[in-house]
Each structure stands twice: as structure tokens, then as C-alpha cells.
Amino acid sequence: MNIGFEFIKYSLIAKGRHGIHSPFVYNLCDQVLRKPISEEVKSRQNRLFKTLKNDATIINFEEFGAGSKHLKKQRSVKQIVTTNSTKNKYGDLLYRLMEAYKPMNVLEFGTSIGCGTLQLHWGNPEAQLISIEACKETYEFAKKTMEQHQISNQVQLINSTFNDYLEEKDLEKFDLVFIDGHHDGKCLIEYLKKLEKHTHNDTIFILDDIRWSTDMLNAWNTLVNDEQYHLSIDFFKMGLLIRQSNKRKEHFILRK
């Protein structure tokens, strides 16, 4: 996939808040995406990423999904954080969505070293957050990070594959689901299918790396055209889906 060409296409058609007639999406643009993040939270974010960028801890990766051909199986934490999308404006998007909509039961697929997990928690510290990570060493590092930030009571980390976790029978109904792992289009669609019984009409699904590969972009386009998702929003790197069966189907390509 030519990511530069994809970005040019996206930039030419992406909208801001003007010309949007959906009340929900207009509010998202006007009151959520444009809302300033407090200096306290910004300071917290900066301290986290400064610490991680200087962490030479080596993690041996077990690849359970479609790992990038350009990334080694053994990487330092400071190498991992340079490719982590939740350290920039997309991390701010996670924070703002959590802060604005106050989801109380949250599921994250793909803890990695815990950056996205912390952004989700900081957005709504009252939420009960479950985060799944299949790689044992990555899970152990993220666990230490949660302990250092003293949020182990609000964040439950589980060392499991996504499929094994979804086999459990007594799962909560989740208000927000963030999927950042595996990077296989077919599997992404299968996970969302399995999550149907564990989510509700207003559950917000956030999908990371929708342009990771042609396969992932094809999966995203399939989901956009799926009649059960009545709202879909393309933020270029991330995509957002909500079922909202009481609303007419709409798709938006928004500038972040």
C-alpha cells in the first residue's frame, strides 16, 4: 500500500465541522475534538513518553497477528514507542472520547506497552478497563507500568489471545472497544462479529491502523458498508463505528 497516496486522497475529501448535519458528529467535531486537553494531563502524557523513549528494556515479541515486516522480533521499549500511534493526536482522540462519553466498561485488544491503556484510563478514571495482550513479555512490562501509575484497581490486564478471551461466557457488555492488534482484516471482522453479544447499540468501536495494509483497508471498507453499523467515521489511521440502529446510516471522513 502507498500510504502517502492514501493520505493525499484522505486529505482531499476529509471534512471539519462545517457542512456536517449529523448532530452527533457535529458535536463530536465541535465539542470533543476541539476541546483543549488540560495542562495537567498534557504534563502527565509528556512524562510518560519521555520515560518510555529513554527505556532500553528489550522485549522479545511473540507475534500472534500480522506483524510488520519492518519490525524485529526483539525490540527495545524506546523503539516500540516511536511507532506507537497513541503517543500523538490519536492518543488525544482516545482520551477525548473517554472524557466526553464516559464509557464505564471498556475493552482494549492489544495492550502493547500500555500507552493507549493509560490514555483511555486518564480520559475516564472511573471506568473499569480490561486490556488484553497475548505477548507475555509485553504484558509483564505493561503490568509494571500500570503499577507505577497506581491504577491496577481500575485496569485489569489479561495475558491472552483475543480469541481465547472471547471464548469466555460471562463477559460484560462493553461501552467502548479499542482494537489495536493483530492487523489482519479477516480476523478484525471476526472479532467484531464475536463481540456483538458483548456490546450494545451505543457501543463505540475504535479501530487502529485501518490503513496498515491493503487487507486492513479492505476490512475497514467492508465494515463501513455493513448495514449493522449506522455510523462510521474515518480519521485516516483510526476508524470509529457505532451501531445506533435507531439512526439512518452515515459515513464521514473527518480531519483529526
What is each of the regions a protein language model found here?
Residues M1-L176, H183-I204, I210-K256:
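A short alpha-helical cap/connector motif
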